[in-house]
Regions:
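Residue(s) in the substrate-gating loop at a strand-loop-helix junction
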Residues: 171
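Conserved glycine-rich cofactor-binding loop
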Residues: 20-21
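Substrate-binding pocket helix/loop in short-chain dehydrogenase/reductase
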Residues: 109-128, 132-137
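Active-site helix of classical SDR
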Residues: 151, 187, 195
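Alpha-helical segment proximal to the catalytic Tyr-Lys
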Residues: 156, 200-201
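Conserved glycine-rich Rossmann-like NAD(P)H-binding loop of the short-chain dehydrogenase/reductase
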Residues: 34-51
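Active-site loop-to-helix junction immediately N-terminal to the catalytic Tyr of the SDR YXXXK motif
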Residues: 177-185, 197-199
């Protein structure tokens, strides 16, 4: 896999949550090829090991580069697990310079079955009135808290260095609500608001915070 840019990230450490997924593993690969030491975070140890091995092999085959990509298993909505991963990553790869918050997703119980209500009340299991409150909380937690908590854990060293980059993953639903996906859109809107807040909050500390709408 070719990377369509060439920047020097030698000496930098990048942490990518959701790093074993399709989108974020590609981001991790690009960072590694550009010279960063990359920690990918996810919950499935076997998948993390498989993705780390594949990215390392792909970089060697495509660029003849020996890159560093390592997997770390933890739950991004569990601050204790994140803190433990932070300590391990710092000891093995160095303190975080780049944080990509890619963990996220949606659940069927938090999606309506129709786009627009056509009658007084819709009786589907997935009508607005029957949405599962636990699944809505799960979507909000994974997307929003799963972005906020890694930032709390991994940015303290950035403040000390007065340098760092945070990349959150927003969505078109952050600014333009899509039908059916109520909880996901709410969460992505919150992420965009959080990103703007952090950009101001960290503005004089040398830390950048951005959110592409993917």
């Amino acid at each position: 896999m070719k990377v369509p840019f060439n920047i020097n990230l030698s000496g930098k450490t990048a942490v990518v949550t959701g790093g074993s997924g399709t989108l974020c593993s590609a981001m991790a690969y690009g960072l590694a090829v550009c010279g960063a030491k990359v920690a990918i975070i996810g919950r499935n140890k076997e998948k993390l090991a498989s993705v780390s091995e594949k990215l390392t092999k792909d970089a060697l085959d495509e660029y003849n580069k020996n890159v560093i990509v390592k997997g770390y298993s933890c739950n991004v909505i569990n601050k204790d697990e994140l803190s433990a991963a932070y300590e391990t990553i710092k000891n093995e790869l160095g303190s975080c310079d780049i944080l990509i918050n890619g963990a996220g997703g949606n659940q069927p119980g938090a999606i309506t079955s129709i786009e627009m209500l056509k009658k007084e009340k819709e009786d589907s299991d997935y009508s607005f009135w029957n949405l599962d409150e636990d699944r809505i909380r799960d979507v909000m937690d994974l997307n929003y808290m799963g972005t906020l908590l890694p930032i709390q854990v991994f940015t303290k060293d950035m403040v000390e260095k007065r340098s760092g980059s945070i990349i959150n993953i927003a969505s078109v639903t952050s600014i333009l609500p899509l039908t059916k996906v109520i909880a996901y859109g709410n969460a992505k809107s919150a992420i965009l608001n959080l990103t703007q807040w952090l950009a101001v909050h960290f503005g004089e500390s040398g830390i950048r915070c951005n959110a592409p709408r993917l």
